[in-house]
Amino acid sequence: MTKKSFVSSPIVRDSTLLVPKSLIAKPYVLPFFPLYATFAQLYFQQYDRYIKGPEWTFVYLGTLVSLNILVMLMPAWNVKIKAKFNYSTTKNVNEATHILIYTTPNNGSDGIVEIQRVTEAGSLQTFFQFQKKRFLWHENEQVFSSPKFLVDESPKIGDFQKCKGHSGDLTHLKRLYGENSFDIPIPTFMELFKEHAVAPLFVFQVFCVALWLLDEFWYYSLFNLFMIISMEAAAVFQRLTALKEFRTMGIKPYTINVFRNKKWVALQTNELLPMDLVSITRTAEESAIPCDLILLDGSAIVNEAMLSGESTPLLKESIKLRPSEDNLQLDGVDKIAVLHGGTKALQVTPPEHKSDIPPPPDGGALAIVTKTGFETSQGSLVRVMIYSAERVSVDNKEALMFILFLLIFAVIASWYVWVEGTKMGRIQSKLILDCILIITSVVPPELPMELTMAVNSSLAALAKFYVYCTEPFRIPFAGRIDVCCFDKTGTLTGEDLVFEGLAGISADSENIRHLYSAAEAPESTILVIGAAHALVKLEDGDIVGDPMEKATLKAVGWAVERKNSNYREGTGKLDIIRRFQFSSALKRSASIASHNDALFAAVKGAPETIRERLSDIPKNYDEIYKSFTRSGSRVLALASKSLPKMSQSKIDDLNRDDVESELTFNGFLIFHCPLKDDAIETIKMLNESSHRSIMITGDNPLTAVHVAKEVGIVFGETLILDRAGKSDDNQLLFRDVEETVSIPFDPSKDTFDHSKLFDRYDIAVTGYALNALEGHSQLRDLLRHTWVYARVSPSQKEFLLNTLKDMGYQTLMCGDGTNDVGALKQAHVGIALLNGTEEGLKKLGEQRRLEGMKMMYIKQTEFMARWNQPQPPVPEPIAHLFPPGPKNPHYLKALESKGTVITPEIRKAVEEANSKPVEVIKPNGLSEKKPADLASLLLNSAGDAQGDEAPALKLGDASCAAPFTSKLANVSAVTNIIRQGRCALVNTIQMYKILALNCLISAYSLSIIYMAGVKFGDGQATVSGLLLSVCFLSISRGKPLEKLSKQRPQSGIFNVYIMGSILSQFAVHIATLVYITTEIYKLEPREPQVDLEKEFAPSLLNTGIFIIQLVQQVSTFAVNYQGEPFRENIRSNKGMYYGLLGVTGLALASATEFLPELNEAMKFVPMTDDFKIKLTLTLLLDFFGSWGVEHFFKFFFMDDKPSDISVQQVKIASK
């Protein structure tokens, strides 16, 4: 019997209802009462029998208190433990006060939230909030779920068209949906610090500091404590800054006209509710559309850059003329009616038709609210940004297994110390402390910090290429990618298509490739081009819309005018009366237009789609368009039909299917698709680095195959699997580009022959063939051998990515962020390419920097006023942003730098402003110079903090379409992300290896070497500590190589190569230590009774062990540093390279007594010549032995082979 889940949501995997336990019943209270009571009884009544001294009192009580604190803190570390310790489970929602939520993967952390109850109109409402989403209890279904939105319920168009707005009491709806705002509470510094202070790592580090204090390492312990607290404080400040940034992403409430209770009223935008009717006007500079809406009447030009990242303004048209019985298709034909919250309306056209609802008083377009608050597109993006901050973490399961593996060695070392110490008669309390120190030494506290630093350095490196990431946990995924999928148009080819001419106009022409200019085209063709487009002219004169349509109209001579009119010299004025927007499902668009009082329909679309709508198909129709598509051109067919004169209402009632049937052919539009500059180089690099590159496009298969050959996705002869003929009998046919090879395929009974198909040809598959093959037993085999997918819909792109993931491959999808949203979200690594230029982005960055300086200057001015200090002068870079005056001496200079011509009138006005007296505020005991200098210093640093820190995400940086967003249109973003992904992976492996060896050597040093009486002096410990600090700071700074390697990084640590290398290197280190210790005892016999408490005194044992351990630390970093073929070699990491060289030089100089003064300063004792030779050779043996075993295991056991789907690329590339 399956367990019932109380919550229905895609982000919730499971849930449990909870009731709090009483304090006494909690595991950190009740079980400890008898333990404390037993200790008290033993202490006061049987002290001499059981405790026998203050040391054991401390051990027993310390262990008991530590265990109590540990159990008390466990609920703060794990939400399941918190539920177990603090709550009882129940199945009755009326009893429950809290609920435990288990989230689905990559949707934030699990959590316990309070269940709230409110009585409304006599009925009880039960709900809770989780991750800014509200969940309400539905008594009938016995489940919590988010409030239902009509837009998610597959509604009919008529459900929105008939809406008359809200009436009556809206208290219930306000409670149900909440405010239309982003309520992100900002905790105080101390609240956040308390949260960090109970984290397992922080508690463990403080516990270690306490142990070192007990062992009388005062300076070392207090310094460590200071460093730990400082690092946590810095992390808290960083989180606070990020939360404040998220808070600014909300839209400040402003007044909007809303149709409620059958009249227009002015309300604040935060009061909006779903199904409210609102008037949308041009948004103010600092504002935006307040929520998700659907246009009911009128039209708008919007800029969606703040949401999708795309800066090209889009035309949005209403659903007024859509058939009321049709289903709403938000991802299809109705996409053009959606206004997303957070976007900007640049221009609005009010409704032209009369309706039951009076026109808005502000002349805006009529729209209906679909979603509010965090449920909107912008709200979802902000939620992703907020909760992705928790996701930069190591693989917890692998890290835990790794630590358990190291603990085995720590337990063995502790057992040795206990046995040997007991034999030597050491104080047992001191022995227990030593044993605990050994066990804690193998838990590397640096591990999470180092791995997080690796991911953050990758984020910072990507930001320099204008690539931003909302889900940092995906960066290591990029290092494991098997399959790279690319859209064609706008991704591999440029957005700006070049208009080459018209084809197929004359039926008599023998040359099927003849191109006609606009001057040679008949008027009917010119009129279709002028009508079948969606370009709009803004009030400021800019024309917005598809770049391809802009190029076409410009080449033919049409000028776009206001109010859906076009004008062409010699042709006259053309008015577009109604548009049927392009649909990816229909693969065509249409318009109804009027020219010289004649009404006609103009249709434009894919040649094979238009072919089916023609009343008479011209001869050579297929030959003409296929001839151009084979050579890589983009081909669109034009068609039209005359319409009788009719009224506007009749035009509005026309059915799209009727308009687009019985058409007359008017020619083909031919465009050249230039490849992006970096497309060929990017695909070549991926092919050579064990990746499979495939193309998934909605374009024609012949064009797709041509472009795939140009960029290097396919090399050999290609067969296209498509429908066999015009009939709907589901029969398929493999045919080559020239149609000289054809192999029939019946999906109902045929199977794929590898020797005849996959071993001889590259394969391309169409969307039609994919549908026909649904459920075929060999579909996955076909996908494994397919290079190009053409004429596929957005849903099919999503299906392909999901299937490749199910087949066990790591997938990457690179698309344009508008048509490819589903596929981008399904891929392990989704990359949305936007259309920015580097120059434009630099200008935007400079603008942001100046805005930051302006805000900081205003804050500093307020700070001065609070301390009764004079206002500091305005810095020159932002002088033009403030009015002239005595405190703005650089005003004229700043205006000149911005290109303003300084007229005598401007100069006179500035002089007058500068001559005004400045109110001098009494210094109030503080010097005037210091605060002003502070302000200047802060301003100079504003906006320039670009280092190795992960950049703070802002709206407009990230696209809601994909986890990765490239603001540049460069395909090289793919290789940059893979490069950084491999770098992060390699960093992870190297950190595990280095920390493992350091911990193992530390366990050996704290046990066997310590018991032998070896102690190190302050100077020696300082040198060793500095080496480790420099190396740990430098090690993750290795930059990835420009060229992607054919080799692939290890995906995990538990394999023969990694574990074999760690254990073998450890064995080499132990062997050299044992050998040197043996040689030392020959010269300096071991004391029969070692005094472990004595002060440090130089000895041959101390000298030899310290020098060899110094070299072991060098070899640990140098041998396990992961450089080529993934990152720059160790010599390029200057800090680490010279640090290691310096320490190696110190060790060799000390071992050979090359500089006697150095040995004296380091507190080393003189050595015999024979011992110096043995010591030096042992140092070399230790280093080269470690190097040898590492390379042995790497050569024989490293699993760097590509997956089977990637191997095929190598095979075909070698044809």
Swiss-Prot record:
Topological domains, Lumenal: 44-56, 217, 426-427, 1012-1017, 1085-1099, 1152-1168
Gene Ontology biological-process entries: extraction of mislocalized protein from ER membrane; intracellular calcium ion homeostasis; intracellular manganese ion homeostasis; protein hexamerization; protein transport; protein unfolding; sterol homeostasis; transmembrane transport
Activity regulation statement: The ATPase activity is stimulated by phosphatidylinositol 4-phosphate (PI4P).
Sequence intervals crossing the membrane: 28-43, 57-76, 189-216, 218-246, 396-425, 428-442, 446-464, 972-1011, 1018-1035, 1056-1084, 1100-1121, 1134-1151, 1169-1197
Active site residues according to the UniProt entry: 487 (4-aspartylphosphate intermediate)
Region (N-domain) residue spans: 497-674
Cofactor: Mg(2+)
Start and end residues of each stretch annotated as P-domain: 466-495, 677-837, 954-969
Protein name in the entry: Endoplasmic reticulum transmembrane helix translocase
Name of a matching Pfam family: E1-E2_ATPase
